[in-house]
Amino acid sequence: MKMIDDVIIIGIDSGYGNIKTANCCFPASVSTYAKEPVFKENLLVFESKFYLIGEGHKEFLADKTRDLDYYVLALAAIARELNIRKMTCGKIRIAAGLPLTWVSGQRDEFRDYLLQNKAVDFSFRNVSYHVEIVGVDVFPQGFAAVADRLSDFRGVNMICDIGNGTMNIMFINDKKPVSGNMFTEKYGTHQCLLAVRENVMRAHHTAVDETIINRVFRFGTADIKEDYLKTITDTATDYVEGIFQRLREHEYNPELMRLYVLGGGSCLIRNFGVYEASRVTINDDICATAKGYEYLAYVNLLKNGGIV
């Protein structure tokens, strides 16, 4: 997080699989209870309701304002960032984002959603917090992660941000983003996970735990029998081939441009992709986009004379 005067800027990358801030990452899932649950390691209490953060699985919602989940997850993200600085209160400016082609249509609604309470009292992990939400900025995903290094993007560059639910594609040509050449595809890593489950069930007549699948995605292997591993890696390889097919449909040509891959799915490109390494850059910092949101909000405030 960054600070201007007494205002704390906290970047929150509200993904469909994980919530990321500049310093932490946790599952984007919430279970709600009317009474205090037995297990409460990641318990958040807000307006007399109990929320277990990281429990269950959050379904894909193109409209993140449809329920209260992403608001509660934002409170958890704020608490985790404040905890790093040993703080429990403060003025907060949220720097958030949406998929590239959804920003213009959903920005105002998402901003109002995160601003629904100016003063917020809640507790997380048995620590009480009092925060004042003084503003919300909403930026485009993908671009935010590279906004602080545009000078590195000479020539033609394709940016590919692979998240859990979506894949965002844009171009940066001679250090400038091309606003009319941006795309959002519902082809995130969750689609690969579903394909793995289906193929393992078809080939081996058994279910495979998501923990194993994610480990193979991240490291290319896991402590399982070879025939199961082959089914998973073959499926992941097919998924990555699908990514490159979609990139080519959007004019990707490795001979004429460089490719910059980021997001949680970047590990799949590294482990299962076939590409010319000298022309592809993989940024596997899962918090890069949240850091970018903070950077953009900070720069905007400085341009505005520090006025929040």
What are these regions (language model features)?
Residues 169-174:
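PRPP/pyrophosphate-binding module of the type I phosphoribosyltransferase fold
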Residues 197-203:
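Acidic, metal/cofactor-coordinating or nucleic-acid-engaging core segments within structured domains
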